[in-house]
Amino acid sequence: MDVTKKNKRDGSEVTERIITETVSTRLTSLPPKGGTSNGYAKTGSLSGGSRLEKHSLTHGSSGYINSSGSTRGNASTSSYRRAHSPASTLPNSPGSTFERKIHITRHGTYEGSSSGNSSPEYPRKEFASSSTRGRSQTRESEIRVRLQSASPSTRWTELDDVKRLLKGSRSASVSPTRNSSNTLPIPKKGTVETKMVTASSQSVSGTYDATILDANLPSHMWSSTLPAGSSMGTYHNNVTTQSSSLLNTNAYSAGSVFGVPNNMTSGSSTLHPGVSTCSSVFGMQNNLAPSSSTLSHSTATASTAYGMKKNLPQSPAVVSTGVSTSAACTTNVQNEDLLHKDCKFLILEKDNTPAKKEMELLIMTKDSGKVFTASPASIAATSFSDDTLKKEKQAAYTADTCLVSDANGDVKTVSTKGKAASAEMHNYNHRGGGSGGGGGGGGGGGGGPWGAAPAWCPCGSCCSWWKWLLGLLLTWLLLLGLLFGLIALAEEVRALKARVAELEQSRSNVLLFKEEMQRANKDWLQGEAPSVEAGGKLGLDGHQQEELWLFVRNRLMAEQENGNLRGSPGPKGDMGSQGPKGDRGLPGTPGIPGVLGHPGPQGPKGQKGSVGEPGMEGPMGQRGREGPMGPRGEPGPPGFGEKGDRGAAGEPGVQGPPGVPGSVGPKGSGGSPGPRGPPGPMGPQGLRGEVGLPGIKGDKGPLGSPGPKGDQGEKGPRGLTGEPGLRGLPGAVGEPGAKGAVGPAGPDGHQGPRGEQGLTGMPGTRGPPGPSGDPGKPGFTGPQGPQGLPGTPGRPGAKGEPGAPGRIMTSEGSSTITVPGPPGPPGAMGPPGPPGAPGPRGERGLAGESFMGSSSSISELLSTRSFKEPMQTCHRASFLEARVAKTTPALSGRHCVLDTCRKGVDLRGPPGPPGPPGPPDLPFRVRQDPEAPQVKAELPGKRYESIGTQSLGLALGKSLPATSPQHRVLETYFSGPPGPPGPPGPKGDQGSSSLGLNLQGPPGPRGPKGDKGGSSSSTMFMPGPPGPPGPPGPPGSISSSGREIQQYISEYLQSDSIRSYLSGVQGPPGPPGPPGPVTTIAGETFDYSELASRVSSYLQTSGYSIGSSVSISTEDIVAALQREYLRRAGGWEPWGLGLPLPELLRASEEALVLVPSGQGRPGCGRAVAREPCGLGGPTPALPVLAGDDVRQYLRQYVIGDWSLQSLDYAELSSRILSYMSSSGISIGLPGPPGPPGLPGTSYEELLSLLQGSEYRGIIGPPGPPGPPGIPGNAWSSISVEDLSSYLHTAGVSSIPGPPGPPGPPGPRGPPGVSGALATYAAENSDSFRSELISYLTSPDVRSFIVGPPGPPGPQGPPGDSRLVSMDGSYSRDSRSSSHSASVSRGSSYSSSMGIGGASGGSLGEAGAFGLDMGLGRGYGGAAEGGMYGGEGGPLGAGFAGGLDYNELAVRVSESLQRQGLLQGMAYTVQGPPGQPGPQGPPGISKVFSAYSNVTEDLMDFFRSKSTSVIVFLTPCCPVRGALQDHQVGLGHPALEGTREKKETKVTKSMRGGEREASPSSHELPLEEQPLASVLAMAYGVHVKISPKGGSWRLTSY
């Protein structure tokens, strides 16, 4: 539509031709419901890939501008555009159409120009700072406009930017110059450019008006004046690339200048080029967010926008709705009508846009030159340095932007009518202003009449008068309602206040009344005196009596309630008569509905019903489909025609001659058909025909011709920045670096965290003797016997056979751990001497006071209660605590009750006076966890109770992890390594006979004391190698019992079974060292030499003659106790599972038999012995401790706290001795030696048991060797096949790993060869096997069982079974000893002990811990000249008949290796030179039968190549921590011989190009990895972890 306006302004007549552009947009389908509407899933905005047809028809007419009589130019365009926007949110479904029309007026009016042929002029926008100019901006712009209007020749000279634009693409500075830190251009001038922009290819041209722009209305418009005919494309100005390119794209317009998008992101242009139809100037775009472009060109909506658009981060691809207004003279009413009637637009995607969006309205005002002012809410955050923007900031605070008008204060409202699913109204804050209001924009709302609302109305664009009226009425109603509500509420409050006051008044009155009543009662009772009656009696009147009665009654009732007056119960009253029947109770509440019952059984079938009446006739069914055509019918019968009429008779002719008979005439023609009969009745409906077969599939049609290529879609908005991706997988582990040089030993580590509660400290010094106790009742004085003659020493028996390995057993729960003891040859018992005559019984002494606290000892414990008396307190957790280094050994030879705790309750009493510290290097210390729950285990025949649920691992050579639950139970400590046993000393002289107790002579004097073992607060210590044998010591007296203890410990530590666990591959013997003090984790130090001296002093002070020879040794007592105890208990197990104490005491009472003379009984044999064995002849025995004297003394401690600290050893010893002498125990001469006994409990076994109990040091040295016994066979029922098959099936399987260090002690082993033990093993072989299996599969043990044993070492000389002299046995040459250690991540750990002894370990973050303890013999040792157990020892026959511990250890560990325990750990082993070993055993055929050939090949390869091999292990799973390059010195002297250690050459830096010497490598398949590690450790090669891939690489240098 064309509207012609005439304007009188500044003396020039301006005639405008208003061109109306009608844009018809047809929406071909509605958006899908619920669909997200943007192609970018990340941006969360609108997509859908729909199509929108848009017909844009622009009517252009030549507009002329008449100023001073000259025609300006022709600014007309006409174009028709049909565009398909492929990325619109509306799908292209032809079913639904949505049309809308937009009428946009353009005014191509140039006002005030002085030249007819020049382009419209605009003041040049300057972006430089105006601080250097002295004039204000308003004045400056005014002067420039006037100058440009006056002189047309110089009009373009100042407009540098516009001139560059006219030069085409050579221009590079249309936009303001700005640094990369600014996101907005900083305009310093107002502009008069008023071109209008639509984001969706509709364009509106503005009016070029050369009036002065008010400086208060800042415009962020980039201004240019293009002559008609020049076109310019989108100008990108990205912050990163400061380049500018003017793209002359395929714009349909004659003069379209696109704005300068300032994208912080490096996105595409904000407004897609080539979509506007008329000369249009796009405003400056400022994308403050990395979302998509602001004016979303991809959504082909008809929204229009002008000038600045600020896009918020929350609305990517939001359609910016703007207003196209035209600033003509407001005196022309027609223009205002046009403004409201035609400048309407529609947001199609309004439903999908966020509700609170900032949509700026960019308004052109009449006098300001159609400036688009934007007021985004965050504009105050931008850094503009000009006062223009400061003014704008003051005017543009709110997100609801403002429409600004200048000249006459009229508010030009723009209506946006949304025809989408919901038309959302937006409120805008319209401010009327003179020439300088701040401006903002926005869109939305519904239309309304002009000026319907006052200027302050926040919704002036949408409110009509009736809406205002309705709003006012509703507001008044609301206020009235509030008023009435408040009035009613006030009334209620007033009434409530009155009520409260009334209640308060009444309450106070009641209180006053009560108080007065109470006062009056007191006055009545107390204030009046009783009257004196006539008889002289005091009396009260009736009222007072009543009050007194009430008072007394109340008091009595109160007392009765308190229970003070309750008397004794009276006799039971007679039963009363039955009362009348009560009334019927009310009906109870209905109960909860019961549970739905089960369905009842099916009832009987009912009778058949009578025939029902026929139903009504149903409706006629649908007609069936046409059936298939029936077969052709049979031919019908022939038709019968009627005979024709007979013809008339002919005249008779002349009778001729008879002719030839004629032929038969033709048949007559058929008659006509008869009439059709009536139709017959309708036949019954035919059956429905079958569905026909599907037809043949038609041929494929010809390929259609390709459709025309669609128009290129507009570029979509830039998506949001993607979220950071997931973290990539870790890269492959790099090659292991070169091995660094061994660093110096690190400083001592910091003190570890505070350990758990330590064991009870050493008992204090002996206190002063207390006052004498009350004298006891005098005992019956027995007849004083004559002093017996000392017995002659018995002849030494033949050397005994080595016994079964000792076992250190602890119990915690159902798992027991057994460390095989060393097989020492138990000496046969010497024959007991002849009994001496009993001496006279002494007087009973006074009971002495206990001086050591509140504890008791074992002997007191036994004497405190009758052995036959039942005891209720059968076990305590503290009983089972084995204090190796804390408690004092119990009494020496006089203690007759030694091992009554073998099977169950620890009868340990309180600790005695503080013993001296023991020898060093006790490999373990067991502390029962007192918090462990009680667990009851059922064993055959008896019910035992065990304490503790976790398997108590004795960490020999290895510390439990600090986080494991066993850490509290087990504390291991090592100081220095024990020395090896010295050479056997000469046999000691036989002691003289005095009391008849045969105590062997002690070992010789000790050698020089060696260096003190290094103590550490850590629990990782490696025992060093043993020293060389010391010189034989001279015989000593019994006073050296402290040395005996040391010797016991030394023997125990040097026993083969302990060495096989403590040591890896053994080195040569080191120098002997003396025992050093043992330092525990808690820092306490024990010296066993001092301990021995204290025990000896106790024996001496007890009145016992030390030098005397006694025919009954403590071994007899121990053996008797053990034998009888086992015979009664039916099995054997040490201080872990317990009998109840009464049974235990009864057993000990019956077991303590002292056989003084007679022929010795045969020793206990295999599984047959059920009677006492091996003590002596059949002399009747007497219980030693059954006397009342000893019982009475010990009973107090049974009830006490079960500790040993308060026991008076002197008194206990004297009581026991006096009881023995008074009870007629005859200690006679020794009898002849008995016949060789069957193998009994080995001496080392008893030693090992006693080392872990309270009874260390009690047992004297063994007697002379007895004759060899018959070897037992307790293990014959368990074969290596059972073990290996179990290991394959019992879950001990994982990915194979290299061997590790030796592990902890094994489970409770089978009983040895003593009679009861063998019996137990024979009867419980299955349970033992299950125990072994459960132990081996427990995670605690699996973490320890790592390293395989080496091949057997060289055969050593046969040892002597007697205790060797302690001289030099612990001496060690400290000068040749060096020990360095470093435990760190990935570092190497090595140590060399003494003369080439090897000890090493490494602890990485994965917790692997290696240990090697080189002792002088091969793995498993050859103590008696053969394999384990000696040449003909009880266990030396292998698995078929006996048990070869060496073979068993090798096979079990190899099987564990094969099953892959402790995968990924490896150790570099390099041992010291050793002597060449004998020929090794054959290949590992039973377990590793498949690897025999591989073994030979590998050995040949190793021998042929060189000495050092690097084994690259490939751990299957990443080992936590760096075990790579962990190297542990672990040599095998037998196989390594005397060759020197050959180090691997590792260069300094891998980066410098230097590498390791080029190896020749052989790859092994993965299944042979365990073998490679076994061989590597066995042959002392370097083992190195390297994550190479699928195979192990054996590389030789």
UniProtKB/Swiss-Prot annotation:
One of this protein's Pfam families, by short name?
Collagen
Region (Necessary for interaction with DST and for the recruitment of DST to hemidesmosome) residue ranges read 146-231
Composition bias, Polar residues: 58-96, 111-120, 170-184
Nonhelical region (NC16A): annotated span: 1-567
Q: What's a single GO BP term from this record?
A: hemidesmosome assembly
Q: In which tissues is it expressed?
A: Upper lamina lucidalhemidesmosome.
Bilayer topology annotation: Single-pass type II membrane protein
Gene Ontology MF terms in the entry? extracellular matrix structural constituent conferring tensile strength
Annotated segments matching region Nonhelical region (NC1):
1573-1597
Among its keywords, does the record have Nucleotide-binding?
no
Basic and acidic residues composition bias: residue spans:
9-19, 1537-1557
**Among its keywords, does the record have Secreted?**
yes
**Bias category Gly residues: which stretches?**
665-674
Q: Where is the composition biased (Low complexity)?
A: 604-632, 730-748, 774-796, 847-857, 1377-1393
User: Where is this gene product found?
Assistant: Cell junction, Hemidesmosome; Membrane
Spans within the Cytoplasmic topological domain: 1-468
Q: Which PANTHER family match?
A: COLLAGEN ALPHA (PTHR24023), COLLAGEN ALPHA-1(XVII) CHAIN (PTHR24023:SF891)
Q: How does it assemble?
A: Homotrimers of alpha 1(XVII)chains. Interacts (via cytoplasmic region) with ITGB4 (via cytoplasmic region). Interacts (via cytoplasmic region) with DST (via N-terminus). Interacts (via N-terminus) with PLEC. Interacts (via cytoplasmic region) with DSP.
Q: What does this protein do?
A: The 120 kDa linear IgA disease antigen homolog is an anchoring filament component involved in dermal-epidermal cohesion.
Look up the record and name the associated disease: Defects in COL17A1 are the cause of generalized atrophic benign epidermolysis bullosa. This nonlethal form of junctional epidermolysis bullosa is characterized by life-long blistering of the skin, associated with hair and tooth abnormalities.
Protein's recorded name: Collagen alpha-1(XVII) chain
| Taxonomy of the source species | Eukaryota, Metazoa, Chordata, Craniata, Vertebrata
